[in-house]
Amino acid sequence: MRFFLLMAVIYTTLAIAPVHFDREKVFRVKLQNEKHASVLKNLTQSIELDFWYPDAIHDIAVNMTVDFRVSEKESQTIQSTLEQHKIHYEILIHDLQEEIEKQFDVKDEIAGRHSYAKYNDWDKIVSWTEKMLEKHPEMVSRIKIGSTVEDNPLYVLKIGKKDGERKAIFMDCGIHAREWISPAFCQWFVYQATKSYGKNKIMTKLLDRMNFYVLPVFNVDGYIWSWTQDRMWRKNRSRNQNSTCIGTDLNRNFDVSWDSSPNTNKPCLNVYRGPAPESEKETKAVTNFIRSHLNSIKAYITFHSYSQMLLIPYGYTFKLPPNHQDLLKVARIATDALSTRYETRYIYGPIASTIYKTSGSSLDWVYDLGIKHTFAFELRDKGKSGFLLPESRIKPTCKETMLSVKFIAKYILKNTS
């Protein structure tokens, strides 16, 4: 059975030509009133728009800045309509395919080898996990927490001294396939944590007293697809019953206010919630792991892009969590710490009031499970490159984010029981 599944995946991959995005554009639109919002919503009835920010048409609101991708064929219609209704816009990306190719602006030190300065495909990441085990056997262990619908392994790296039970932080990257800077950070974190142990006082103390569970790529199948077939792919690769559209948005698939957002029940949307809470193998693997380590995990951090934000619960309601003052304090100091490296400015706050309401998110699920320090990073940039952050900005992004994560970890070590 496994052989036939593998052959089906290989056949599918070979049979489908990779998507090209020649002369596709990314627009940024400022919606100043209800009429503007209505015009944009009406456009989606006849033109396919790929929303970059917010994630879907039902999330747009007055006074919001909206980023979306459109085909070359439809871009002139979009421009004419926006100008006709006096809606302010700018074109962030004039040729998406060109921007995709420009993303790889760092040369290989050694061809084909894993690099922290470059984006790495899934095969390189798997090989990297093996090398981390070999290099730091006393500090790193690899746990297979499950597998995907295409039978790829879901690996968590446990970082920390192996003696005894201790506090832990769970971190995941790459829940959305096209957000490549996210897995790049998880790799950087593991590298820096192990490299600086015994040299950096703060990291040494953290690793002596707590563990980090790091899931470098949450959405493995989608990540592979974004490398081989469709750079703009977001969801996983599960098949949907009674629909030819593929995939579920894993960050809408958690069992927390799962069905409260409009239109997330449509399989062809990028924000499709799935047929049931935790229906996806990836979601189930992560939730089972966190439940089984509930006594030790004191904080949860998930990494996304883009927008330069540090978000706290809730997303499904404007109601604030009981310890919101504590969470906001941590977020404020963490973003201040981040800015000390390159003066990169992040905003912070609850998901619902800072960006938009959302349902079924990992952040809210973990918080409601009982882990009361949960954070979501939206990494660089603010939209100029969007999901196509050039490789030359990987290291600066990771270095500044590391400062923020180290502060959060120190706070958790000191202030949780």
UniProtKB/Swiss-Prot annotation:
Q: Which residues form the active site?
A: 378 (proton donor/acceptor)
Q: Which GO terms describe its cellular component?
A: extracellular region; transport vesicle
Q: Which reaction does it catalyse?
A: Release of a C-terminal amino acid, but little or no action with -Asp, -Glu, -Arg, -Lys or -Pro
Q: Which organism is it from?
A: Mus musculus (Mouse)
Q: Hydrolase: is it a keyword of this entry?
A: yes
Propeptide residue ranges?
16-109
Q: Which cysteines are joined by disulfide bonds?
A: 173-186, 245-268
Signal peptide (from-to)? 1-15
Q: What is this protein called?
A: Mast cell carboxypeptidase A
Q: What is its EC number?
A: 3.4.17.1
